[in-house]
From Swiss-Prot:
Protein name: Acetyl-coenzyme A carboxylase carboxyl transferase subunit beta
Segments forming domain CoA carboxyltransferase N-terminal: 39-308
Family membership: Belongs to the AccD/PCCB family.
Any Gene Ontology CC annotation: acetyl-CoA carboxylase complex
UniProt keywords, alphabetically: ATP-binding, Cytoplasm, Fatty acid biosynthesis, Fatty acid metabolism, Lipid biosynthesis, Lipid metabolism, Metal-binding, Nucleotide-binding, Transferase, Zinc, Zinc-finger
Top-level taxon of the source organism: Bacteria
Reported function: Component of the acetyl coenzyme A carboxylase (ACC) complex. Biotin carboxylase (BC) catalyzes the carboxylation of biotin on its carrier protein (BCCP) and then the CO(2) group is transferred by the transcarboxylase to acetyl-CoA to form malonyl-CoA.
Enzyme type, top EC level: transferase
Taxonomic placement: Bacteria, Bacillati, Cyanobacteriota, Cyanophyceae, Nostocales
Swiss-Prot/TrEMBL catalytic activity: N(6)-carboxybiotinyl-L-lysyl-[protein] + acetyl-CoA = N(6)-biotinyl-L-lysyl-[protein] + malonyl-CoA
Cofactor note: Binds 1 zinc ion per subunit.
This protein's encoding gene: accD
Length: 316
């Protein structure tokens, strides 16, 4: 009897949460307070309230409409890398201000504010780990740090990661999300495009796999360099991917662009990406691709006369 009452009580509680999520809180002030406290998350696409714990369990993908919310670098690593296998690289690299750049505030002040607010030294985390027991070199960009912009530190960390992967014969996976090259570093940021591309070319010459994953947004100098140099290019659903911004292109061409312009779906249709993979399937997809492209062991070739000698011995 007690068990039945307990079951009915739990069912009522679950029904209340379900109705609350669909209908929204009746008191706007209470709703905003609970969202601010992090208990609930309001989807920016469909407006449905979801319990934050449930959203995280679904890898920050809305359970109602499938909208892929942005995730930070730590969360992305947790989603992809096997537990207790992550070994970060170059954690202490930090940007300087060689140009003494200043817009509304000094670049050095911006860097300090980002570090204090986020606990990050720059816009990418790199390291070695395993995806379903397969070794991998992984770089994860973080849009929270100055829009994921690519400066000297981002370029150096990714280049070092690729060089380490080439030496160890590891595949490379880069989770891309960026507004492009960092304007506060001028030409130094643009140099990173060529620097990373050269490292990837050496990695490719070693016949090793590179997979970029394009997430929302991937634009500017990142798109114009390593984001589009993959052996297999993956993208998340509805991700904005392009070089110049939509408004800039419309003003230049004086034309209205299609609604799906610069979306992952449009790029797939025109052959710029190879597949669109939902975040909840990304780890297994990467694991399968890595397993299919395991590097062939480098063994010294057998010279012709040795082959003939072995054949003669077999005949005798």
């Amino acid at each position: 009897m007690a068990n039945n009452e307990e079951s009915r009580g739990l069912k009522s509680l679950f029904d209340w949460f379900a109705n609350r999520r669909k209908a929204g809180a009746t008191n706007p002030e209470r709703q905003e307070r609970e969202i601010a406290d992090g208990l609930w998350h309001k989807c920016s696409k469909c407006g449905v309230l979801t319990y934050t714990k449930d959203l995280r369990a679904n890898q920050m993908v809305c359970v109602e409409c499938g909208h892929h919310n942005r995730v930070d670098s730590d969360e992305r690593i947790r989603q992809l890398i096997d537990q207790n296998t992550w070994r970060p690289m170059d954690e202490n690299l930090r940007a300087t201000d060689p140009l003494q750049f200043r817009d509304r505030k000094a670049y050095s002040d911006r860097l300090r504010e980002m570090e204090d607010k986020l606990g990050l030294l720059d816009a990418v985390k790199t390291g070695l780990g395993q995806i379903n027991s397969s070794p991998v070199a992984l770089a994860v960009m973080d849009f929270r740090f100055m829009g994921g912009s690519m400066g000297s530190v981002v370029g150096e960390k990714i280049t070092r990661l690729i060089e380490q992967a080439t030496q160890r014969r590891y595949p490379v996976v880069i989770i891309c999300t960026s507004g492009g090259a960092r304007m506060q570093e001028g030409m130094l940021s643009l140099m990173q495009m060529a620097k990373i591309s050269a490292a990837l070319e050496r990695h490719r010459d070693a016949r090793l796999l590179y997979i970029p994953v394009l997430t929302n947004p991937t634009t500017g100098g990142v798109t114009a360099s390593f984001a589009m140099l993959g052996d297999i290019i993956l993208a998340e659903p509805k991700a904005t991917i392009g070089f110049a911004g939509r408004r800039v292109i419309e003003q230049t061409l004086r034309e209205k662009l299609p609604d799906d312009f610069q979306t992952a779906e449009d790029l797939l249709k025109h052959g710029f990406v190879d597949d669109i993979v939902p975040r909840t399937q990304l780890k297994n997809t990467l694991s399968q691709l890595i397993a299919l492209h395991q590097p062939v062991p480098t063994t010294p070739p057998m010279v012709l006369w040795e082959t003939m000698s072995l054949s003669s011995t077999a005949v005798e």
